[in-house]
Structure formats: C-alpha cells, structure tokens
Amino acid sequence: SGLSIPSNIAEGMERFSKKEKIRFLDIARASCAELITQIYIGIKAGFIEKNRGLEIKNEVEEISKILTSLIKGINNANS
C-alpha cells in the first residue's frame, strides 16, 4: 500500500478527465488508510518501534489530508 500511494497519484494526474483523476486520487487516499492499519499492525507485532511508527502514521495522515484537498480542488475547478 505504501508504494501504491504515489503510483496512483501519478496515474491519476496523467488522466484527462476530472472523474478519472479523482478516482485514482481517491484510491491513493484509501491506500493511506490501508498503510496506517499496516503500521498499527507492525507496531503491535513488534516489527516497528512505537514512536517511529506513530511518526510515520502522522506523515501518512498528512498525505491523506493533502490528497483530500487536491480532490476538492479538482472537483471545484471550472474546466
């Protein structure tokens, strides 16, 4: 899911229609949620140190917020 975030952003931004752009950005945003879940699992299983995991989770949440803003901006664009 970590790799699918930038991959879906790139693919979406190459699309011509608003609908297609938004679809791929929404998939990227969903991948953020999936990655956050995997981070929590990694912390619980002892594979990720808790403080570092929470730092990464916060960064992923910020990326998700940016994607939400981008989706809203594309939705509101006049073209």
Q: Model regions: which residues?
A:
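Short, C-terminally biased terminal segments at protein or domain edges
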Residues: 1-79
